[in-house]
Amino acid sequence: SGDGITVYFNTYVLAPYASGEQAVSLSFIEYPELIRKQYQKHSDQWAIPIAEDEMCLVDLDGDGAEEEISYSADRDEYDYADSIVIHCDGNSYDTAMFMDSDYYGGCGYSASGYLVRTQNGKTWLYLETMGEGDGKYLQIFELMKNDVRFVTADYLGIDPNQPFDPESFVLSKRFDILGTYEAYKKFHVEEDGIPKTEDLLWTIVSTYTDWKVELTSSIDMELSVREANTKRGSGQKETLPAGTHFVLLKTDGEAYAEAILDDGRICEFELEHPSEEEWEGRINGVSISDCFEY
């Protein structure tokens, strides 16, 4: 983070399982001789992970005194909780109190989060919960010395395999466009605490995962096809025969998807939204389920 390095140890390395997660934090200021200058970030922006029931100390108002931050949940025998309780500077805030603006209210089977500091000195809690069907839900709160403010929420997930830096991090979202999958975009945190992206499309297949969404057509399909590394819309219409193999690459999350062909070219799917009487969209007037082998 901008303040130092935190080392997390596997279970049983320092203590028994019952002792919980073991971690050691090394501050750049307190231990300048341990960390070379070129590896010190020295940024006013930072993000640190915070697990359920873990306590972190953060100076929320810049007065030099650190406030205690944590969150907890009253879980049933199936590990399900109706809401999350955020503990901030001795006060407790149940996410159920934000139900008017956040219907989901933080319920789920698990929770994980990050404390995020932005350039303007404000501190945010990025709280992710996982509900039915492993659906991820990201809620953002502003943490203040005497208050917690709900900012926004969306069906997004923090990629645990990628570093979380306020200037660049990865969020995922589940889609049902030509298949069911998670796709990713790179984001940064704005000064209002809300993640913003410059990416126009969500990435389905990338360096973030080896998993692929593959399709094989069951009918001849007329699609726009272009060379790799060229702009969307720059291709030509081409009839691809039944049996063509596609690997999905990107989507706009609504009615557009890109796939790579076996010869390396890119084809574009423009989807027609279903009517009120239909449950699925169409491609060139044909129901999606009739376009591919399943």
Predicted regions and their residues:
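Short aromatic loop motif centered on NTY/YTY
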Residues: G2-I5, G105-V225
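Sequence/structural signature of beta-propeller modules
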Residues: F9, Y17-Q45, D199-I219, W279-Y294
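Surface-exposed loop/turn elements that mediate protein-protein interactions on large endomembrane-trafficking
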Residues: L14-L26, E30-Q40, V85-F98, Q139-Y155, ...
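Short, conserved secondary-structure segments in the cores of folded domains
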Residues: C56, G235-Q236
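Calcium-coordinating acidic loop motifs
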Residues: D59-D61, R117-T118
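Glycine-aliphatic tripeptides that mark coil-to-beta-strand junctions in extracellular
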Residues: G64-E68, K122-T123
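Short alpha-helix capping/helix-loop boundary micro-motifs
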Residues: N229-S234
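SH3/SH3-like beta-barrel superfamily modules
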Residues: Q236-Y294
